[in-house]
């Protein structure tokens, strides 16, 4: 696919790059990992001031509409700079509320999301329901939950859970668990919660939200991979062995070239998924909200596009992380070196919102594996 951003979209990306480059994102990530979200929330507010979160919020709720291409531009930069927090989940929750079309929860949360003042964690049971008579809608238990994990549930302002055909606001969470990325901590939403909506429309909106989450994770991974590659190129130009820069060795060049090719192949898939999401959203709005055969077929095609982008970008970023670690040596995974933050993030993003095997199954077999 040949895809060119317009001047306004490119300038938007450059503006985000400059703003995030001037901020101490690495410091914010390290603070977030020990539950000090203050520096990270300041970054979130600056992102909101530039309109990032408004890109998923309808105009009637102080947003810009749903603009997947601009979201891809933004999330590549968020991944490049390693912005902490549930950025994917917050935007996916906004997409869920927008697609659901229920005015009450939309008015309650969307303006705050657009303004950057409301962090949302989001978990989805992918159509599974509790088999004990519905007493535990989240798949959890009274002791703290055993359903799907929610990223940063302990620091988010709100945690949404889709369980079967119900959308709930969780009342709490279970024990906080570490992950490969110290700034991405996980917890299972607690038993019960406020029911915000129910019915087939919830499942349809949830499918869309999960697609958006996978798509944004792919964009983040692409940005993280590019950062890892750029930092490694800089390093091998500086490090010397036998009196010459190690970057002059053919084996090193080939390793970096492989990483670059993978990232270059992933980029059109990410933006292709953005175009597909934009087209699907426009068609959905033209025919009105609801379940229709044509809409279901279009949505399935979009999910395959998103899955292709997710597996390509996730594997490319992971490959860049492996190359970065190999060429930096043992210093690459030390906590003191910022590179380790991106290495760990790339590994976590690889499996977030769809593992490589799940995404490949969807692309190759057309399997709707999440639902």
State what each model feature region is.
Residues 1-79, 116, 136, 211-371:
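Alpha-helical interface subdomain recognition
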Residues 23, 77-78, 97, 159-162, ...:
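Alpha-helix C-terminal capping segments
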Residues 22, 46, 96-99, 109-112:
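Amphipathic alpha-helical regulatory segments at dimerization interfaces
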Residues 104-230, 234:
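FAD-binding core of flavoproteins
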């Amino acid at each position: 696919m040949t895809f060119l951003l317009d001047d306004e979209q490119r300038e938007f990306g450059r503006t985000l790059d400059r703003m995030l480059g001037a901020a101490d994102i690495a410091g914010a990530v390290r603070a977030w990992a020990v539950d000090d979200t203050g520096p990270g929330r300041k970054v979130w507010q600056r992102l909101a001031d530039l309109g990032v979160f408004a890109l998923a919020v309808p105009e009637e709720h102080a947003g810009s509409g749903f603009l997947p291409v601009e979201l891809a531009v933004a999330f590549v930069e968020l991944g490049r700079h390693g912005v902490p927090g549930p950025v994917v989940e917050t935007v996916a929750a906004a997409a869920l509320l927008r697609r659901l079309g229920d005015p009450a929860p939309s008015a309650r949360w969307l303006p705050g999301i657009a303004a950057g003042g409301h962090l949302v964690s989001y978990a989805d049971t992918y159509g599974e329901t509790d088999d004990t008579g519905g007493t535990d809608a989240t798949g959890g238990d009274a002791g703290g939950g055993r359903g799907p994990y929610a990223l940063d549930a302990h620091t988010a302002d709100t945690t949404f859970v889709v369980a079967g055909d119900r959308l709930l606001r969780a009342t709490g969470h279970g024990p906080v668990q570490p992950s490969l990325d110290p700034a991405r901590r996980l917890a299972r939403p607690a038993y019960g919660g406020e029911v915000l909506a129910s019915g087939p429309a919830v499942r349809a909106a949830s499918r869309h939200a999960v697609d958006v989450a996978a798509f944004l994770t792919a964009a983040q991974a692409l940005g993280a991979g590019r950062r890892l590659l750029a930092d490694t190129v800089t390093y091998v130009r500086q490090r010397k062995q036998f009196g010459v820069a190690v970057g002059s060795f053919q084996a090193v060049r080939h390793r970096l070239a492989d990483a670059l090719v993978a990232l270059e192949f992933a980029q059109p898939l990410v933006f292709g998924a953005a175009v597909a999401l934009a087209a699907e959203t426009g068609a959905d709005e033209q025919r009105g909200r609801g379940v229709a055969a044509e809409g279901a077929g279009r949505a399935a095609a979009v999910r395959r596009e998103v899955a292709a982008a997710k597996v390509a970008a996730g594997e490319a970023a992971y490959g860049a992380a492996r190359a970065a670690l190999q060429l930096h040596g043992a210093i690459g995974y030390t906590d003191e070196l910022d590179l380790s933050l991106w290495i760990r993030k790339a590994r976590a993003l690889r499996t977030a919102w769809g593992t490589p095997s799940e995404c490949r199954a969807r692309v190759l077999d057309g399997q709707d594996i999440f639902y």
